[in-house]
A protein has these predicted regions:
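Glycan-processing catalytic domains of CAZymes
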Residues: 1-248
Length: 248
């Protein structure tokens, strides 16, 4: 399986694999309809880009044109092109806020419903920063979320999130693993640790691992994305297995 190889250096190190992040926000959702106008998508932002200096070529429209990422035919065509040009796996941003999801149709319908959905390796990244103008979210026992888009969590919520991933994605044969463990990254790892505290984050990650074991799932390989200088030295102690970047 792609990326399922020992993590070590030297002459026996596995060949490098290239995984591309995928933002699944290229379709309309009710929250954006209400915040902007019916049918709004971020293609409007792409079309609206203008040059800001000499040699700045804007707008940049994809060679295949705009598409709805819920369309499995359109998605399959683009995934095949990506694979043919050196992309070995896809890492989909999963938006989750205490049980609320947005833009899941791009992954569930567009990718997994396509002809390549059961063969192209893929993994998930917890996008614990909701897209603009899809907040606030209210649950009976919780306050309205801060519109700054940060996604608070706790141990029970993190276990529920990982359980959702396990039931829907980890169980698939083309899900990316590292040394036999399901790869999962957290977009704002610094906020996650700050929100729960070091002990709380460690407890949440440990509880999620125990839930996976109790329900017959593989363990996690949990990657912290761009932890800040304060969080980085704590990553291993908190329970992260690796550190990576989102934008270099």
């Amino acid at each position: 399986r792609i990326l399922d190889a020992p993590m070590h250096g030297g002459q026996h190190a596995p060949p490098m694999r290239t995984a591309a992040y995928v933002y699944t926000g290229w379709h309309a959702i009710a929250e954006r309809d209400a915040a902007f106008h019916p049918g709004f998508t971020e293609w409007e932002l792409v079309r609206g880009c203008r040059p800001r200096f000499a040699g700045h070529h804007q707008p940049r429209i994809p060679a295949l044109g705009e598409y709805d990422d819920r369309d499995p035919v359109a998605v399959a065509r683009r995934v095949r092109l990506a694979h043919e040009h050196g992309v070995d796996a896809l890492v989909f941003g999963v938006f989750w806020c205490r049980g609320k999801r947005v833009f899941e149709a791009g992954l569930d319908r567009g990718f997994l419903g396509s002809e390549v959905g059961d063969t192209m390796p893929f993994a998930c990244m917890w996008a614990n920063r909701m897209p603009r103008r899809v907040l606030p979210v209210r649950r009976q026992d919780l306050p309205v979320l801060d519109p700054a888009r940060e996604v608070p969590s706790d141990e029970a919520d993190f276990v529920e999130f990982v359980a959702m991933l396990a039931d829907n994605y980890f169980c698939r044969p083309n899900y990316v693993t590292i040394e036999g463990r399901n790869y999962l990254s957290i977009f704002d790892s610094t906020f996650f640790v700050r929100e729960l505290g070091v002990d709380g984050a460690r407890a949440a990650i440990g509880a999620a691992r125990r839930w996976l074991a109790a329900h017959g799932h593989r363990d996690l390989h949990l990657a912290a994305i761009e932890p800040n200088a304060e969080t980085l030295p704590l990553a291993a102690a908190v329970g992260f297995d690796s550190v990576t970047h989102y934008v270099l």
